[in-house]
Amino acid sequence: MAKVTAGRDELGQFAPKFAELNDDVLFGEVWSREDKLSARDRSIVTVTALTASGILDSSLKFHIQNAKNHGVTAEEMSEILTHAAFYCGWPKAWAALRMAKEVYA
């Protein structure tokens, strides 16, 4: 996985420790443990967790794109979010599916 610098780019001046943890720990360490869980599977977990939490903003779109980049197909993403709808709520899944439709267009 390519080095992530979004934390430093977006929040480095305002919240340097948060930016460091985002870039170096979350993306630098956790996401790089592919011997434990593949980046593809981490992407699926992340998209599902964000949807269930109601985080339906640019971060969800980023992670849907990330899932696509890690090999999750449009058909799989549709099924993942349809399945999640029954556990996280129909409106959240609806919003996530619309976002996924844009990403996979």
Regions found by a protein language model. Name each.
Residues D41-L50, L60, I80-L81:
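Short, structured motif recognition centered on aromatic/hydrophobic residues
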Residues F27, H63, F86-Y87:
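Aromatic side chains
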Residues L56-S78, T82, K92-Y104:
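Extended intrinsically disordered, low-complexity coil regions enriched in Ser, Thr, Gly, Ala
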Residues A49-L56, A85-G89:
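Short alpha-helix boundary/capping elements
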Residues M1-D41, A52, N69, A93-A105:
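Acidic, glycine/proline-rich low-complexity segments that act as flexible tails and inter-domain linkers
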